[in-house]
UniProtKB/Swiss-Prot annotation:
HAMAP family: TMP_synthase. Its cofactor is Mg(2+). It catalyses: 2-[(2R,5Z)-2-carboxy-4-methylthiazol-5(2H)-ylidene]ethyl phosphate + 4-amino-2-methyl-5-(diphosphooxymethyl)pyrimidine + 2 H(+) = thiamine phosphate + CO2 + diphosphate; 2-(2-carboxy-4-methylthiazol-5-yl)ethyl phosphate + 4-amino-2-methyl-5-(diphosphooxymethyl)pyrimidine + 2 H(+) = thiamine phosphate + CO2 + diphosphate; 4-methyl-5-(2-phosphooxyethyl)-thiazole + 4-amino-2-methyl-5-(diphosphooxymethyl)pyrimidine + H(+) = thiamine phosphate + diphosphate. Mg(2+) binds at D70, D89. One of its GO terms (cellular component) is cytoplasm. This is Thiamine-phosphate synthase. CDD domains: TMP_TenI. It comes from Caulobacter sp. (strain K31). One of its GO terms (molecular function) is thiamine-phosphate diphosphorylase activity. 2-[(2R,5Z)-2-carboxy-4-methylthiazol-5(2H)-ylidene]ethyl phosphate binds at T135, T136, T137, G165.
Length: 219
């Protein structure tokens, strides 16, 4: 791929789902977003289901794919477009059986090309590397170097997602390095001018990074 797009992740808790739905609509109207990952770690099934039921129509009305974190069983039952798996979650082959051949399945690979290649061979639709920067959204067991994005971009067809502490101030370098998607949570939801401005700022940084990527390749 020679493009890079925003992969938006929900905050870790949604205390007021209706209010967040308005924030999500504003964010998605702020610029290009490829996918929304609903990530509610350790939340009860009914809370996750309620979030999917409220947020999915908002995303899909704007052609944004809906990915559920960790739970292929719920993702299949709730009709999500895909699921994101951690290294300690359900095996990819089992998730594929639940989700079907058309679902998007991504896998966290930390800072390891070996894990990413295993995921690719198992049929992952994308691999996620990180964390690239300090993050308070989730515990990050590894720190990744942007070089892994460049190597992956040059050698593999499956898209890569960069994750971990990404904001408008540091996104351009990851887009330039070769990331196909930038996974962002707090960089949008905690943007000082609001989530719509956060999405717009990330997209502007991505455009800057893609210009640098093309220039480095002599384009």
């Amino acid at each position: 791929m020679t493009d890079c797009r925003l992969y938006l992740i929900t905050p870790p808790a949604l205390d007021d789902l209706a209010a967040f739905g308005h924030d999500l609509a504003a964010a998605l109207d702020g610029g290009d977003v490829a996918a929304l990952q609903i990530r509610l770690k350790d939340a009860p099934d009914d809370i996750i289901a309620a979030a999917v039921q409220v947020l999915s129509p908002i995303a899909r009305a704007r052609d944004v794919a809906v990915i559920l974190n960790d739970r292929p069983d719920l993702a299949a039952r709730l009709g999500c477009d895909g699921v994101h798996l951690g290294q300690d979650d359900m095996p990819l082959a089992q998730a594929r059986k639940l989700m079907g051949p058309g679902a998007m399945i991504g896998v966290t690979c930390h800072d390891s090309r070996h894990l990413a290649m295993e995921a690719a061979e198992a049929g992952a639709d994308y691999v996620a590397f990180g964390a690239f920067f300090p993050t308070t959204t989730k515990d990050a067991p590894t720190t990744a170097d942007p070089e892994i994005l460049s190597i992956w971009q040059e050698t593999m067809e499956i898209p890569s997602v960069a994750i971990g502490g990404i904001t408008a101030d540091n996104a351009a370098g990851l887009a330039a390095a070769g990331a196909d998607f930038l996974a962002v949570s707090a960089g949008v939801w905690k943007h000082p001018q609001g989530p719509a401005a956060g999405v717009a700022a990330i997209n502007a940084a991505i455009a800057q990074g893609l210009e640098a990527r093309l220039a480095a390749r002599g384009g």
